[in-house]
Amino acid sequence: MADIALLWDSKLLFEKFFIEHGFDHQLIHPANMGSPFLPPFKMILIPTGFANPKYSNILPSLMKNKRRIESFITKGGTLLVFGALTDSHFYEWLPVDLEYSQVYGPAELHEKCQSNASLLASDPVQECDGFFCTNGGECILVNEKEEAVLVTQQFGEGMIVATTIHEFPNPEFIRWALDNSTSTAI
């Protein structure tokens, strides 16, 4: 049974990354969320560019499934979401206050708060596609301008991890997140 639901509307390199590191995953179109035929998952991963129609058309489905996403997190699932890849984006489909601003380039990262979520960044210098202007959670990593690039928010029994780091997550982070999540329906 798959541990990770990769929400997207076409094939992605993330699938190769998961296979290379031994993570069980399933590519799910967000329009299929709530289907009784989907297995439970420990993590939902939403890649960079989800709000940009050049890369994906999943944003309307995310908006429509706001309650399902909230329920998944509340019951112990982990949501890992990357940058919107638009000039700005309010994550209205999440149960937390989160606003994104796009600025692409390398960033020197510093830990603002101690958290195992910082495992996501394998190196202190990472490509980032922006920062979070507002966040209702805990700021874990910031860039050299003290702008948030990795934030977390406990919600119910689960967690939201939002990042603007524009690289694959460190496999250690995925293992940590899966070990600390509960399988639940989306």
State each model region's role.
Residues 11, 16-21, 105-181, 185-186:
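Catalytic beta-strand/loop cores that center a nucleophilic Ser/Cys/Thr
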Residues 3-93:
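Helical hinge/lid and interdomain linker segments adjacent to catalytic or ligand-binding clefts
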Residues 24-28, 46-47, 63-65, 99-102, ...:
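Short, low-complexity, polar/charged sequence segments that are solvent-exposed and flexible
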Residues 51-135, 141, 167, 183:
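A glycine-rich, often tryptophan-bearing local segment used as a flexible ligand/cofactor-contacting loop or short
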